[in-house]
From Swiss-Prot:
SMART domains: HTH_ARAC (SM00342). Residues 227-328 form the HTH araC/xylS-type domain. Keywords: DNA-binding, Transcription, Transcription regulation. PANTHER family: HTH-TYPE DNA-BINDING TRANSCRIPTIONAL ACTIVATOR EUTR (PTHR46796:SF12), HTH-TYPE TRANSCRIPTIONAL ACTIVATOR RHAS-RELATED (PTHR46796). GO terms for molecular function: DNA-binding transcription factor activity; sequence-specific DNA binding. Pfam families: AraC_binding_2, HTH_18. This is Probable thc operon regulatory protein. Residues 244-265, 295-318 bind DNA. It comes from the Bacteria. Probably involved in the positive regulation of the thc operon for the degradation of the thiocarbamate herbicide EPTC.
Length: 332
């Protein structure tokens, strides 16, 4: 086996021409499984590039010859496979489908799975997403405002030619491109959690499942709940918050929280968080010693990674630049 060194962003690439070794790599990154070579064993090779961000593992998997893969129940995870080229004959429990670049396969956590593919003489990589079961069910619970007791029953076919399907695929493909970057933004600690939640939320909207209809039943939050949410944003502004986290902590669904913010404040929870962070950054700038702290350090402390954009929005909000505020009041 050859293994590329960690690229500095948590991404690793594995290359193996040994069947047992390839099985061990896949089992370690994803799930215990069996691999049966249907094509020419003499040219067998497995290549995998993968990284985890929060509760999501995203990888590109390719074999040099046709194989068949079997797993038992995934138990602690849900899974999605998207062939970037060619076809993947696959099943989850009794359900069967042929996954293509236009149709992803979604796997339940409580069913056995099988895959058969990679017969093409050309590279046919598959985007493989492993999603932590608890994280996805918590995400759904936050949006519904009620606990998820039973496993989510997904339909196996996810149409990637619908509007939401294409948009979700674009998000996944964008993340997959970042696997090759040593400075992948999606794997930055302050970005990875919201990015993973965005991907999970998108899947819940794009895929067919037994809770999907309930996602479109808004129940407006009370102003008191909005107040609690604003207090929570104030107290945790330095953390990489998401709407789902805020909704969960104040006990309402994401949709209810969004409606409540729009009705009460005329904005969204995340825009309100940005305002709070901007105000806290200004407070730090006015109190800072320019000799020991700069605009960049303070901006990044409050989650503004693009300092130039921060400076522009700061001036638009307060009428002065961050550097002007940094020099305004002597260090106290």
């Amino acid at each position: 086996m050859s293994e590329d060194p960690d690229r500095g962003n948590g991404t690793k690439t594995y290359l193996s021409d040994d069947i047992d070794e390839a099985r061990a790599i896949g089992s370690d990154l994803y799930y215990p499984h069996e691999v049966r070579v249907l094509g020419d064993e003499h040219i067998f090779q497995m290549r995998m590039t993968a990284a985890s961000f929060g509760p999501v593992t995203l990888g590109r998997l390719d074999y040099s010859t046709e194989v068949e893969i079997f797993t038992n129940e995934l138990r602690d995870s849900y899974h999605v496979n998207i062939p970037m080229r060619g076809e993947l004959v696959t099943g989850s429990g009794r359900a069967r489908t042929v996954a293509t670049p236009h149709r992803a396969a979604v796997y339940r956590c409580d069913q056995r799975t099988l895959l058969r593919g990679w017969a093409s003489p050309y590279p046919t990589p598959v985007l493989a997403l492993k999603i932590d079961r608890r994280a996805l069910e918590d995400q759904l619970a936050a949006r519904l405002g009620s606990e998820i007791v039973d496993p989510i029953v997904f339909g196996m076919d996810l149409d990637l030619d619908t509007v939401v399907g294409r948009q979700w695929l674009s998000l996944v493909e964008g993340l997959s491109h970042q696997l090759d970057s040593p400075e992948a933004l999606a794997l930055h600690p302050i970005v990875s959690t919201p990015m993973a939640e965005c991907l999970m939320s998108g899947l819940l909207v794009a895929a067919e499942h037994d809770y999907r209809a309930r996602l479109y039943e808004p129940k407006p939050a009370l102003p008191g709940i909005v107040r609690l949410a604003v207090d929570y944003l104030e107290a945790h502004a330095q953390q990489p918050l998401t709407v789902a986290q805020v909704a969960r902590n104040v006990g309402v669904s994401v949709r209810s929280l969004q409606v409540g913010f729009q009705n009460s404040l005329g904005t969204t929870p995340m825009r309100q968080l940005k305002i709070i962070r901007m105000q806290k950054a200004r407070k730090d700038l006015l109190r800072a010693d320019p000799a020991s702290e700069g605009v960049t350090e303070i901006a990044q402390r409050w989650g503004f990674l693009h300092v130039g954009r921060f400076a522009g929005e700061y001036k638009q909000t307060f009428g002065v630049s961050p550097s002007e505020d940094l020099r305004t009041v002597p260090f106290r």
